[in-house]
Design a protein with these regions (language model features):
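Short, solvent-exposed loop/linker segments at the N-terminal edge
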Residues: 46-52
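A short beta-strand micro-motif common to beta-rich folds, especially ectodomain repeats
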Residues: 95-108, 215-225
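A short glycine-rich, aromatic-capped structural motif
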Residues: 246-372, 402-404
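Surface-exposed binding patches on compact interaction domains or structured appendages
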Residues: 54-85, 125-208
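C-terminal, surface-exposed recognition/capping segments
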Residues: 269, 355-356, 360-525
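Extracellular/luminal low-complexity segments enriched in Ser/Thr/Pro
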Residues: 83-98, 202-215
């Protein structure tokens, strides 16, 4: 009986399996995803000055692209790869010429459009480089400007780096101007696009650009035919005139002595008002010409109960109509080189990239990965120097300050009052001897002149982080000078430079590594 039951179960199982084998499952395959039709222009607006020029417009689309009617006063030339060259001749009239280019993408019965506004001013653009060549030009809102884009920096020396010998001082092979980024201090995304108005134009060795209705900072570059950056310029848009005045340092007998003519604010700031977000300048790695943005977080009015809290250091990553997002990974090391001109060519090519030190080395520099201590030509390089170089980030007529503008410096011991130029708040009496006033309003005042110096923090990666962030905004201030470290021995000393460091507890002249990004208060050449 048991055997018959088992046999019956086996037969049933076989029958079921056979039935399953003969049954065809009716499963519908999911339809292949098809992306919506799109078309996007590299620029939404191009602005020419009265002399005209040409600009390149690139279209990205998953359809077949064609151009529409060309507005009167402009020409359009089609290139390979959905690229067009728009040209404007000399505007001989008294009025601004404007129009609109319409590009259409077609796929089957679908269509999509991208529109590009074209504007040509009737007035001649102001030549910013007429007052001197530089890596930074100051402009006002709602103006049209141009500058010489055939020379690197001020064209006058490379700090002994051999860069000019290897790469020259003239810019060759430039075909197009591009906006790398534009930004406001507050990071307002809607107004960030209003710093630069339209795309910059390269013509006959000059870059022409127009400013919008918003103050801020921007970076404009010249590229070759392959889109590689050949050089770039910081555009500082402020309606508050930048001025200079006496910087006073008492001599050993306490007598006031004018040692420089100093700028009225930090490089890239809109003002120098205590507790004002716009008193923050741009950040610079030592020796580099291209800036990084300060935090967008307002200063705390009630102090900082916790040190270096993330909410007090929000990063400003806006680029507006720029073409290159910020590249601030903490793993961004440059190629491994040990000879001059180091990684200057790499830094020129990637002005939006923060370059870190090589983790296997103790040099704390972006310049080289290793160095022969006996090779003075490498260890004594001064990319920023007492005499202005092509890498100096200050506007024409200004330069990065030299050393000893804020008292003599040396091997500073912050616990030794004799080495300090500013102390703790409770150490100040009516006859205090410090050169810096006590810490107030997120900054300190230089007593001999009354100049305010905001503590803007720094821009550097912290251990264990994947990105470079703003740190210690409103709590710590660091200002670069050109002076190298001369007192230490060992590799680290070769790439340390004087900075003015201040917080609530102290102020002093010390030394910092090249990879740090700090503030600059320019002085007259």
């Amino acid at each position: 009986m048991r055997e018959m039951k088992i046999k019956s179960i086996i037969l049933c199982a076989l029958a079921l399996s056979g039935a399953a084998a003969c049954t065809k499952l009716n499963v519908k395959e999911a339809p292949e995803y098809v992306a919506p039709l799109y078309i996007q222009a590299s620029d939404s607006k191009v602005v020419f000055d009265v002399t005209g020029g040409q600009a390149m417009i690139t279209l990205a689309s998953n359809g077949k692209v064609s151009s529409g009617e060309v507005p009167e006063g402009f020409e359009l030339q089609e290139e390979e790869g959905a690229t067009y060259i728009v040209k404007a001749g000399v505007n001989t009239g008294a009025e601004t010429v404007s129009g609109e280019l319409v590009f259409t993408a077609v796929r089957g019965e679908e269509t999509a459009q991208a529109k590009v506004s074209l504007v040509q001013r009737a007035g001649e653009a102001k030549n910013l480089s007429a007052e001197g060549l530089a890596n930074c030009y100051i402009a006002h809102t709602q103006g049209t400007y141009r500058f010489n884009a055939t020379v690197k920096g001020n064209g006058k020396g490379d700090g002994g780096s051999d860069y000019i010998k290897n790469y020259g001082v003239n810019i060759e092979g430039g075909t197009r101007a591009t906006l790398i980024w534009e930004a406001r201090h507050d990071g307002d995304r809607s107004l960030t696009y209003e710093v630069i108005d339209g795309a910059p134009v390269y013509h006959n060795g000059y870059i022409t650009f127009s400013t919008g209705r918003s103050e801020g900072n921007a970076l404009i570059a010249i590229e070759d035919i392959h889109g590689e950056v050949l050089w770039s310029w910081h555009i500082w848009v402020t309606n508050n005139p930048v001025t200079a005045h006496d910087h006073i340092l008492p001599d050993l007998e306490g007598n006031p002595k004018v040692v420089a003519q100093i700028m009225d604010r930090n490089l890239g700031a809109m003002n120098n008002e205590p507790m004002n977000l716009e008193n923050r300048g741009m950040f610079y790695q030592w020796g580099r010409k291209d800036p990084f943005l300060p935090s967008r977080t307002p200063y705390r009015t009630n102090g900082y109960p916790d040190i270096n809290e993330p909410e007090d250091n929000e990063i400003n990553s806006e680029i507006g109509d720029g073409t290159r997002p910020w590249d601030v990974f903490a793993t961004n090391t440059a190629p491994k080189v040990s000879t001059n001109p180091g990684n200057i060519p790499y830094s020129v090519k990637y002005p939006n990239k923060h370059i870190e030190q090589f983790s296997a080395q103790s040099l704390y520099t972006w310049y080289v990965s290793s160095v022969d201590k006996k090779d003075i030509s490498v260890t004594k390089v001064k990319l920023w120097d007492e005499t202005k170089t092509i890498f100096d980030p200050c506007p024409a007529g200004y330069k990065v300050p030299g050393g000893k503008l804020y008292a003599n410096f040396g091997n500073v011991d912050v616990n030794n009052p004799r080495d300090l130029t500013g102390g703790k708040p409770d150490e100040y009496t009516e006859d205090f001897h410090w050169l810096w006033e006590k810490f107030e309003n997120c900054g300190r005042v230089w007593k001999p002149t009354g100049d305010f110096y905001p503590v803007v923090g720094t821009f550097v990666p912290m251990r264990g982080e994947d990105y470079v962030y703003n740190h210690y905004t409103g709590e710590l201030g660091m200002y670069w000078t050109t002076s190298p470290n001369t007192y230490q021995e060992g590799e680290s000393a070769y790439y340390e430079y004087e900075w003015i460091r201040m917080n609530e507890a102290a102020a002093f002249s010390g030394y910092g590594a090249m990879v740090y990004a700090c503030q600059i208060r320019c002085i007259k050449e």
